Amino acid sequence: MRVNVTLACTECGDRNYISTKNKRTNPERVEMKKYCSRDNKHTLHRETK
């Protein structure tokens, strides 16, 4: 079962991306390095509720 998740920047808190994940194979929160336009660099983005 795939669900939509929102990814927020860990440095500025801006919610920049929407992605999907499979809850059965990845029950924990998703973390990805993505580009943050507010910080103008690649930062760690975490799944938010």
UniProtKB/Swiss-Prot annotation:
Example of a GO MF term: structural constituent of ribosome
InterPro entries linked to this entry: Ribosomal_bL33 (IPR001705), Ribosomal_bL33_CS (IPR018264), Ribosomal_bL33_sf (IPR038584), Ribosomal_zn-bd (IPR011332)
UniProt xrefs under Pfam families: Ribosomal_L33
PROSITE patterns: RIBOSOMAL_L33 (PS00582)
Keyword DNA-binding among record annotations: no
GO CC, any one term: cytoplasm
Gene Ontology biological process terms in this record: translation
Alphabetic keyword roster: Ribonucleoprotein, Ribosomal protein
Superkingdom, natural source: Bacteria
PANTHER family listed in its UniProt record: 50S RIBOSOMAL PROTEIN L33, CHLOROPLASTIC, LARGE RIBOSOMAL SUBUNIT PROTEIN BL33C
Family membership noted in the UniProt record: Belongs to the bacterial ribosomal protein bL33 family.
Name of the protein in question: Large ribosomal subunit protein bL33A
Organism: Staphylococcus haemolyticus (strain JCSC1435)
Taxonomic placement: Bacteria, Bacillati, Bacillota, Bacilli, Bacillales
